[in-house]
């Protein structure tokens, strides 16, 4: 299995892993760009790729940029059949502009295997029941006492 990368301009760099056990490949900016404070910007990587069949690439933030500069990524899926230019959407959650320079590591790419089952529409009562049921939005992260109180409050409504 290989990840094929084609350079689209002279500033492009191939993705690299920071260590032999790193899950992600660092992605490098091929252009200078200012991400405005509390804003966003699309950063060109200057390359296109051939993702291995049976996988997709997920674009994720680099932890250092997130912690030190308040940057995160968005719109981060590269499908197996996409062959166009790869760009990274950066969100700047800080109150200061962030300047990207050519060669900066702006995100990481993680290859993940995918499963694409056939969609089958069924009635609600045909779904397998589970212990969790319809509990969501933090329902599994509360202690038993809080859960009991919430259940009692819902029963009164």
UniProtKB/Swiss-Prot annotation:
Q: What does this protein do?
A: Involved in nucleotide metabolism via production of dUMP, the immediate precursor of thymidine nucleotides, and decreases the intracellular concentration of dUTP so that uracil cannot be incorporated into DNA.
PANTHER family attached to this UniProt entry: DEOXYURIDINE 5'-TRIPHOSPHATE NUCLEOTIDOHYDROLASE (PTHR11241:SF0)
Q: Which reaction equations make up its catalytic activity?
A: dUTP + H2O = dUMP + diphosphate + H(+)
The subunit structure is: Homotrimer.
Q: Which gene encodes it?
A: DUT1
Source species: Yarrowia lipolytica (strain CLIB 122 / E 150) (Yeast)
Q: Report the sequence similarity comment from the record.
A: Belongs to the dUTPase family.
What's one GO BP annotation on this UniProt entry?
dUTP catabolic process
Please verify whether the record's keywords include Hydrolase: yes
What domain of life?
A: Eukaryota
> According to the UniProt record, where is the region Disordered?
125-157
Annotated pathway, please?
Pyrimidine metabolism; dUMP biosynthesis; dUMP from dCTP (dUTP route): step 2/2
| Alphabetically ordered keywords of this record | Hydrolase, Magnesium, Metal-binding, Nucleotide metabolism
Basic and acidic residues compositional bias, start-end: 143-157
Family matches, as NCBIfam families: dut (TIGR00576), PRK00601.1 (NF001862)
GO MF annotations, alphabetized: dUTP diphosphatase activity; magnesium ion binding
Task: Give the Enzyme Commission number.
Answer: 3.6.1.23
Query: What does the entry list as the binding residues for dUMP?
Result: 63, 76, 79, 82, 87, 132, 137-138
Cofactor(s) it depends on? Mg(2+)
> What is the protein name for this chain?
Deoxyuridine 5'-triphosphate nucleotidohydrolase
């Amino acid at each position: 299995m290989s990840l094929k990368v084609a350079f689209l301009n002279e500033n492009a760099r191939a993705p690299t892993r920071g260590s032999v056990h790193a899950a992600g490949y660092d992605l490098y900016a091929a252009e200078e760009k200012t991400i405005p404070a509390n804003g966003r910007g699309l950063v060109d990587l200057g390359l296109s790729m051939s993702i291995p069949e049976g996988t997709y690439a997920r674009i994720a933030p680099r932890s250092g940029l997130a912690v030190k500069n308040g940057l995160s990524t968005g719109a981060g899926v590269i499908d197996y059949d996409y062959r166009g230019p790869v760009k990274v959407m950066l969100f700047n959650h800080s109150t200061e502009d962030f300047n990207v320079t050519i060669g900066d590591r702006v995100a990481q790419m993680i290859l993940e295997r995918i499963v694409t089952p056939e969609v089958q529409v069924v009635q609600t009562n045909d779904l397998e029941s589970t212990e969790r049921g319809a509990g969501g939005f933090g329902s599994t992260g509360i202690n038993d006492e809080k859960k009991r109180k919430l259940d009692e409050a819902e029963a009164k409504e």
